[in-house]
Structures are given as structure tokens and as C-alpha cells.
Amino acid sequence: MNAERLLALYERVAEAPDAIARLRRFILDLAVRGKLVPQDPQDEPASEMLKRIAKEKARLVKAGEVRKREEPDLAPETDEPFMIPEDWRWVPATYPAYTVSDLDKKVQTKDVLESGQFPVVDQGKLFIRGYCNDPQKVIRVSEPLILFGDHTRETKLIDFDFVVGADGVKLLRPICLFTRYYFLALTWLPLDSRGYGRHFKLLRASLIPLPPLAEQHRIVAKVDELMALCDRLEAARKDREAKRDRLSAASLARLNAPDPETFTADARFTLEALPALTTRPNHIKQLRQTILNLAVRGKLVPQDPSDEPASELLKRIAKERTDLVRRKEIRREDALAPIQPGEMPFEVVPSWTWARIGDVVLFTQYGTSQKSNPSDHGIPVLTMGNIQDGLVVSNNEKRIPDTSEELPALYLRKFDLLYNRTNSAELVGKTGIYLDENDTTTFASYLIRLRPSLTSSNPQFLNTAMNTTQFRETQILPLIKKQTGQANVNGTALKNMLIPLPPLAEQHRIVAKVDELMALCDRLEASLTTSDQTRTRLLEATLTEALSPANPSEMEAI
């Protein structure tokens, strides 16, 4: 394997989701199979090295430098996990090393400092956990050693004086072999996870392939070369993705804050470039939000001058609300304050109008305060977890008895909107539309029901408007910036929020276009998933093919 061959391989699998990580693993696989560098018949075989290891271990025990321990047997040939070159040997993973027993100097986690004289190394993912200033706890390192995390399986090569952090650490000092190859082999070794259980026994029972000493050095040099190339490939990929992200963001930004003179050209460019601009799930998410933002700015469908203006809708909704009050189905409420020019987030097209939510819907209502319980009987109670991506999704709700005094008043009806008034700052204000059957389900008190007019508004347009970033940034976030902990945006605040309201006929056209474009986003997302799966299968097939030659003489073809 050389750099040119690796580059050729990378070109075939570059767009697979984990291509670089898999290539790194592939390099290690080649290394421990004797397929990364050619063998040299002049090298002293590994069997001679094993004799020196056994002799050195005996000397250390006799000198009292290490304690005698029960050693795992050298692996018989029948236990070989795969074929290795003739001069290599399989050995138990801990055989060519001895464990350092002087670990009573470890520092407790609570005593680890953010800065200090001596680095603290533990079994966590961070290479250096922190620092310690106590020289009595320092382990002096004259030659590199290996730290193995008994709980985490993390393996670290340490070539500096350090302090051991907390429990679960095993230190291995290699004997008569190249420490960096030993580290490479342990890093490659696949150990089953026992969660936070102990793994050192698994390590002792596992086998690693041991090449001649001279070949160990050649292998490590080649691994260093190819890993450095992987670093460059990874940096180039990140740079490429960052540029693609900036292009995608810039293209969508031009649509979100449109220039009337260039909007048509910007929109055409974005639509034509969609496959190039949407290469990751977050791109699709941004595209979906751009579609919603265009919808509420009057940029998604053309206006029709024959449409009845939105101001007439508000008059009809007000009359419908008055009729409900007269029939005593809802209470009369004070009129909302007129909208001042400075309140409007942006200018709408002439046939549209800005309106307060309380003037657009017939009424708002808090949910049930009755305690709900898991049950197969009764009325399901929807909670904030049921609001997902603009929809109200039913799943495993708790229930209240159907004899509750709050029913039937709090039954949901199809096309009701549910607004989450209490949640974390990131989630408060999320809204979904209820599309299930009438009078079968209710909702919890930290949700607010909005009942739209079904004759003078399109509830799905209202739901779209309340799920835009524009609505969140201008109507919700200003209300929660000064809050700490759980955020709350109550019903009074909700009724006073502003949304842009188009004519009813245009609302219907907008909803149809949003549905069409969201279906396109669904297809793009599915295409991404399919492409990723295809690239992953190609990656698997390519790496399997590259690892398949069993005859060492075939190595040069890799």
C-alpha cells in the first residue's frame, strides 16, 4: 500500500459518511495482516523475539523488578484469527509486556487541576485529563508505555512523565519490541464492550499478530505516512464541506431576505442547484425553513388581484367570533390593541395584512389541569412531546377519565393548533396542527389550543406561519430572552403575536405549494439516505476486496 494506491481507493469511497474513519481502520487492518509493507526474508523471525521476551521476563522477576504472574499460553496455530506471514507469530495481547503495579500514586478526580506542572492521564477519551502539582505522584517514563482503560477500552501511548488519574487504569511496559507497533496492534484489537465493566481480562485473552522487529519499524513508518495523508484528506473534506455549507447558506439567505430586483434569478439558481446545495440533512432542514419563510412573505406563489383582500377575512372572523359569544360558546374578551407600524417585522404585499393571532383565530384555550395516568381506558392527553415538526403526533399518551368535568369543552377538533407555552428556551413556542378525529383526545395545561375559522382561514397556513424562523425570532425569542430555567410564553402574549395574513384563496395556494415543495424535500432526503447507503456499501465492498488476498505474494497488488 502506498499513497497513490490509498488516494485511488479514497476517490472511490470519498463521499461515504465515515470514509476517512474507515480508511484509517483499513490501514490498521493491512498493517496487522502483513499487507502494508513487503516482508524481508533477511529479518529475524518473530519466534526469536519471543525467546528474548521470555528471557527478559524471567530476569525481571528474578531481580524483583516485577512480580511473577500467571502468563497466558502462546497461541497454538489452530487459534489463529486469520493468516499472517510465515515469520510472524500470534501472541496473547499482554504477553510482550508487563503490568506496572505501582499505581497507588493515582490522583482522585476531585483533585485534578485545570493547569499545573504534571499532566494527569486517565482512561477517558481526553488524552490529558488535567494537571497535578504533587511530584510524589509522578510516574517517571524513561521509555514509552501503554495505558489501557479497564472500563473504557481507551488505549494511549505515553512518552512523558505523568500522573495516573482515578481508577480503572492498567499500565503496560513492552519488552523487547517496538512500543509504537505494540500500541498500533492494541489500538486495532477489536474488544467487545462490557459497558462500564472490566475489560482487561478480555485483553489478556485476545491475540495480536507480532511481526519481526525490523518489520515492526517499517510498518509504523508506513502507517505514519498514510495516517498523515488521511489527515490531509480529512482536512480537505472539511474544507470542501465548509465551502458547500457557505454556498448553501448564502443561496438560501438571498431567498430569506430577498432583493426584489434579483429574487427571480436567485430563486432560479437555488432550484437548479438544489442537488449540489443539499448534500447533508442539515441542508435539507435549512431548505425546509426557507420554503416556510418564503411562504409567509408572499414569495412562494403569485398574487391574484381578484382575490378578496385579507382585511375582509378579519371582518368575517370577528363576526364568527361574535356569534360564538352570543351563543355563549366562548367568553367575550377585550379587543386587542391596534398594530403600530413599528411592530411589523417586514412589509407585506398589498393584498396581505399584518394581524394579531388573537384576531385571526376564534379563540384560545389552556388544556386540562387534571392529573393523567397510564391506562388503556379513558381520553388520551396530548403533551408537548406530541408536537413534532409542525404536526401533532399521537403516541402512548396518558389518559384521564371520560367523565372529567373539563370534557367535552377540552376535546380537540380536526385542524385545531396546539402551542407549547412552557418548555425549555429552545422548544417553547413550538406549534403543531391536530389532524385526527374530533372529540376523542384532549391536551395538557401547558399547551394552548388555537381554534381557527374553517371558513375564513386555512389552519395549515396559520400553522406554517407559526413555524417559521421569522415568527420565532420576532415573536417568541424577544419574550424569553430575560427568562431563566423553564421558559413560559403565556396565552396573553400568544394572542398579541403578529403573523402576516394573505387572502384566503392565496392561503390555499400557498399550502398546496408548501406541500409540493416539502414532498420534494422528502425525496431529496430519501435520496441522501439512499446515496449514503450506496456509498457505505461501496466502501464495505472496496475494503473487503482489498483485504481479501490470502497469499502474501499477492500483497503487491494491493
Language-model regions: role of each:
Residues 3, 22-26, 30, 35-36, ...:
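Non-catalytic DNA-recognition/assembly elements of restriction-modification systems
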Residues 88, 206, 216, 352, ...:
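Structural signal for hydrophobic
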Residues 19, 85, 113, 140, ...:
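Secondary-structure capping and boundary motifs in well-ordered enzyme cores
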Residues 163-170, 194-213, 440-448, 459-460, ...:
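A short glycine-rich beta-alpha junction/loop motif
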